[in-house]
């Protein structure tokens, strides 16, 4: 059996090593070539090293090796208090197993002592490596049902090996609902690692979402997990299954057990990114997004929902409830703009947006939304007065100027509407911005009624310089206008206290 020397050397040549935390012992597991597994098991006074390849089956009493697949082998070395013993087992051509036994460096006869040594250590090998788990799970379940399997898992000290048995149990055995409930409670109670809990659950979530009892047990199980990262993996894998609408909603609601808004968002986004998605699902996501604390992540979910081509009116209006929970003016604006660009919005949505603007702190973002609303002719004509009144809440004359200028230049206003806008201009504090607006509208060839309103607004300007600038801009138009306009021009001009500035405008009509 020349493979023995090679095996000893191979124990030190491994890549893709991963550390496995044991409950009471140090265990490391590695792969050397994708097929060969090496396990080192250190328990203070003793050390066991195991290397194997292929499929290995043990006898029903777990005291010997029943068979090894062609080309496979198992090498076991145990060192205790300085004494080293080794066993190498390989398959013969007739299907039997050939054993080699060594004490120290000397090969010994395969006799009763060797068989007893193998019988003494083989159960530890089994429970340390997970070798032969499929056959053992089948054997225990056939003889004693679920309890027999779980009793054996209780004897395993490694989460890594425990999850192997539990996964096989879920994959291969015809578990009823009571058994699934029991497994759901057992897994987080007996496995410390969220990673391995996830390995058990992630491919079998559809079984747990089949009934109310199993769903409740499953949700209680993932609530006991500390890592939102691993909870999100389980839930996203569940969404990949062919679940009913009711089960899918349960998966979405299960995301509430996570504290992390990031991971909640990844779960909701997983579903929203699907090509086919019923209104019921979108509506549920929108409702759940109202509980996302982070404005950034809430906005991601809401904008994805708005991108859906079949968003129902109910879901769309539920978006407004979710937006009401967004504190950031930046993210509120992002969501509102996505709404306005997504579809023809209802009156309720427009009214909610206008109401929400009253609570915004940022003049910049309030201005962005108001300008978008005025860009929609249907909205601006119906809600002209309401939108114009929102300008009063803007503290910055700079942003008020942006809005009022846009209205005067781009809206098809009647004379009454024009007067209302100029009333807002007259109420501004800054003479500079008043003049900016009035000079721009004078360049737009206003009619006589509009020109009269402009001159009246100019009367609200305190600065002689700025007042004269507006009157100079109106000079050519006033000369060919009505007596009423000329009289208004003279009336405003006479309020200029500076002879210099008065002289610049008096010649326009004298």
Map each language-model feature to its residues.
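Intrinsically disordered, low-complexity peptide-like regions
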Residues: 13-14, 395
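Bacterial N-terminal signal peptides
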Residues: 2-12
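Non-catalytic all-alpha helical scaffold/repeat segments
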Residues: 23-510
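Boundary at the C-terminal end of the N-terminal hydrophobic targeting segment
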Residues: 17-19
């Amino acid at each position: 059996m020349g493979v023995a020397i090679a095996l000893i050397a191979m124990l030190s040549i491994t890549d893709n090593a991963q550390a496995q935390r044991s409950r009471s012992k140090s265990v490391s597991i590695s792969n050397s070539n994708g097929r060969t597994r090496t396990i080192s098991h250190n328990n203070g006074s003793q050390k066991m090293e195991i290397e194997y390849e292929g499929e290995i089956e043990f006898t029903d009493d777990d005291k010997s090796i029943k068979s090894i697949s062609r080309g496979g082998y198992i090498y076991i070395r145990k060192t205790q208090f300085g004494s080293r013993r080794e066993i190498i087992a390989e398959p013969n051509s007739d299907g039997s197993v050939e054993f080699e036994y060594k004490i120290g460096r000397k090969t010994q006869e395969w006799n009763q002592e060797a068989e007893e040594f193998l019988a003494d250590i083989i159960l530890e090998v089994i429970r340390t490596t997970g070798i032969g788990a499929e056959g053992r799970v089948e054997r225990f379940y056939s003889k004693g049902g679920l309890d027999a399997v779980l009793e054996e898992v209780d004897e395993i000290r490694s989460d890594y090996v425990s999850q192997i048995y539990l996964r096989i149990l879920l994959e291969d055995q015809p578990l009823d609902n009571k058994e699934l409930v029991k497994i759901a409670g057992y897994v987080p109670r007996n496995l410390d690692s969220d990673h391995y809990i996830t390995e058990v659950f992630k491919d079998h979530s559809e079984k747990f979402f089949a009934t109310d009892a199993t769903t409740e047990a499953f949700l209680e199980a993932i609530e006991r997990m500390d890592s939102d990262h691993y909870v999100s993996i389980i839930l996203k894998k569940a969404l990949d299954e062919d679940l009913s609408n009711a089960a899918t909603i349960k998966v979405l609601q299960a995301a509430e057990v996570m504290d992390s808004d990031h991971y909640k968002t990844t779960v909701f986004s997983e579903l929203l990114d699907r090509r086919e998605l019923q209104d019921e699902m979108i509506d549920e996501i929108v409702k759940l997004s109202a509980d996302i604390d982070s404005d950034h992540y809430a906005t991601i979910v809401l904008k994805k929902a708005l991108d859906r081509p079949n968003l129902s009116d109910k879901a769309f209006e539920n978006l407004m409830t979710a937006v009401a929970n967004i504190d950031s003016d930046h993210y509120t604006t992002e969501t509102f703009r996505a709404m306005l660009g997504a579809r023809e919005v209802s009156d309720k949505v427009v009214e909610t947006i206008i109401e929400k603007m009253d609570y915004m702190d940022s003049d910049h973002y309030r201005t962005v939304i108001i300008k978008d609303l005025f860009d929609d002719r249907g909205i601006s004509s119906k809600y002209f007065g309401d939108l114009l009144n929102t300008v009063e809440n803007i503290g910055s004359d700079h942003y008020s100027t942006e809005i009022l200028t846009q209205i005067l230049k781009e809206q098809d206003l009647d004379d009454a509407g024009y007067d209302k806008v100029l009333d807002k201009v007259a109420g501004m504090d800054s003479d500079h911005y008043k003049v900016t607006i009035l000079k721009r509208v004078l360049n737009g060839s206003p009619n006589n009624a509009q020109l009269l309103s402009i001159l009246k607004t100019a009367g609200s300007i305190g600065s002689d310089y700025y007042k004269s600038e507006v009157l100079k801009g109106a000079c050519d138009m006033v000369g060919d206008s009505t007596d009423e306009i000329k009289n208004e021009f003279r009336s405003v001009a006479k309020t200029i206290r500076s002879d210099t500035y008065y002289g610049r405008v008096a010649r326009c009509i004298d």
